[in-house]
Structures are given as C-alpha cells and as structure tokens.
UniProtKB/Swiss-Prot annotation:
Belongs to the L-seryl-tRNA(Sec) kinase family. ATP binds at G7, L8, P9, G10, V11, G12, K13, S14. It comes from Methanocaldococcus jannaschii (strain ATCC 43067 / DSM 2661 / JAL-1 / JCM 10045 / NBRC 100440) (Methanococcus jannaschii). It catalyses: L-seryl-tRNA(Sec) + ATP = O-phospho-L-seryl-tRNA(Sec) + ADP. GO terms for molecular function: ATP binding; L-seryl-tRNA(Sec) kinase activity. It comes from the Archaea. This is L-seryl-tRNA(Sec) kinase. The keyword Repeat does not apply. Gene3D superfamilies: 1.10.12.40, P-loop containing nucleotide triphosphate hydrolases (3.40.50.300). Transmembrane segments: none annotated. It holds the Pfam family KTI12. One of its GO terms (biological process) is conversion of seryl-tRNAsec to selenocys-tRNAsec. The keyword Transferase applies.
Length: 248
C-alpha cells in the first residue's frame, strides 16, 4: 500500500506520518516512512545541483520498499504531477494507493514556521500556497482518500482502520493524464528550481522582509518573461536566473 501525503510546509506531515506508522505497526503492518528530506538532510550543506539526485534516490527507495512494505511518502507533493509519478510506482506493482491531504490555513502554516525558526522563508510558503494543486480538483485519479485538518484532533486508529480496509480492495487505476506539452514539464522544473534558488539566496543573505518581497517579485517577473518564449532550455534559464539574482 502506498500512502501519499500532500500538504504544505508546517502542516504537520512528519508528525502525522510518524504517528500513523506507529498505529499501523501495532496492527502488524510492515510500514516505512520515506521522503526526500531523508536524503536531503544527509548532505552537510544544500546545493541546487543535488536536487535531481535527491528526487531520483527518493523514488528508487519508494520503488524498492513498496515491493514488500507499506510506504508512507512524507513530502509536500504539491503538484499533481508529483502525485502522478508516485501513483505510477503503485501501478507498477499493482498496489493500492491513498492520497491523504493535510490542510491548515496559511496563517497557521506561517505561525508554525516561525515557531520552528523559519526553516523556510515565509514568502516561499505563501507562494507555494498560491501554486498548490489541490488534490482532486483536476483529475479523478488525484482525489484524496482522506482530507485531514491538522489544527483539530486526529484519530489515528480510525485512519489506520480505513487504510487497512482499502488495502484489501482490488487496486483500481484511472488513466493518468500525462503532460502532452514538453514545455509544461520544463515550466514545472523551472518553477520548482527557481523557488529553491530564491529560498537559498534569502537564507544566505539574511534579507529583511522588504528585500524578500523584492526578490520574490524579481522571480515572478522573470518567470513571466520565460513563459512568453517558445523554446526554453531549462539549464540555460536557471543559470540566467542565478546570474540575475547574484547581480541584484
């Protein structure tokens, strides 16, 4: 069984996944929690060039573990394309999957982020909130099995019971919509990578709120310009954005 968590930073995914795993384990379920942070935090420092390796390694771990165990994916998975890639792994082994959508208001996410020492710049969380692909809004296969408000009490025993029942069903897979336009994939990559570049830049420069807003706006205008281009080379564009930021 593949359990795909989706939700923004500060919503409580890691706490949720650990608590759920404990309850499932008490029900004699062999379960493992996996996510990109497991690998990302193994690097002593973060560099943008590591991200492709981190993504591929995370997927390989999930792919390998799903053969024998239940897997809880502890990641934001905020684009439906990310959730689709994970569902394809479940499909590969004919395993059931369940998307669990963890929700909280933007105010709560920001407050929690501040309480943990602003691990991620608040402006980045706000942008992710705006860009978030809400599960089930566009595709049938993307509909959440459960929607959880993490500001309320959570009954993990009841959630575990529902997941165990679902795991006994015959897996059903809808036709997954693929990105027909290559530029959509490139745009997703550029959007994600420039977000990371900005996040790292803000952290390294220790910018104040006004400067953060300026940098976020700079990225926004840069992406508008890129969207007007017919042919886009992602690597060249990312280098151009880094140069722009460094000269700012």
């Amino acid at each position: 069984m593949l359990i795909i968590l989706t939700g923004l930073p500060g919503v409580g995914k890691s706490t949720f996944s650990k608590n759920l795993a404990k309850i499932l384990s008490k029900n004699n379920i062999d379960v493992i929690v996996l996510g990109s942070d497991l690998i990302r935090e193994s690097f002593p420092v973060w560099k943008e060039k590591y991200e492709e390796f981190i993504k591929k390694s995370t997927y390989r771990l999930i792919d390998s573990a799903l053969k024998n165990y239940w897997v809880i994916v502890d990641d934001t998975n905020y684009y439906n394309s990310m959730r689709r890639d994970l569902i394809n792994i479940a499909k590969k082994y004919n395993k059931n999957y369940a998307i669990i959508y963890l929700k909280a208001s933007l105010d709560v996410l920001i407050r929690r982020n501040i309480e943990r020492g602003e691990k991620i710049p608040n402006e980045v969380i706000k942008k992710m909130y705006e860009k978030f692909d809400e599960p089930g809004k566009k595709y049938k296969w993307d509909e959440p099995f459960l929607i959880i408000d993490t500001t309320k009490d959570i009954d993990f025993n009841e959630i575990a019971k529902k997941l165990i029942e679902k795991s006994k069903e015959i897996p059903k897979f809808y036709v997954l919509e693929e990105n027909k336009n290559k530029n959509n994939n490139i745009s997703d990559k550029i959007d994600k990578e420039t977000r990371k570049i900005v996040s790292e830049y803000i952290k390294s420069k220790k910018l104040d709120k006004d400067k953060i807003k300026e940098v976020v706006e700079l990225r926004k205008e840069f992406l508008k310009k890129i969207k007007k281009m017919e042919e886009v080379d992602a690597d060249r564009v990312l280098k151009e954005f880094k140069d722009l930021l460094n000269s700012y």
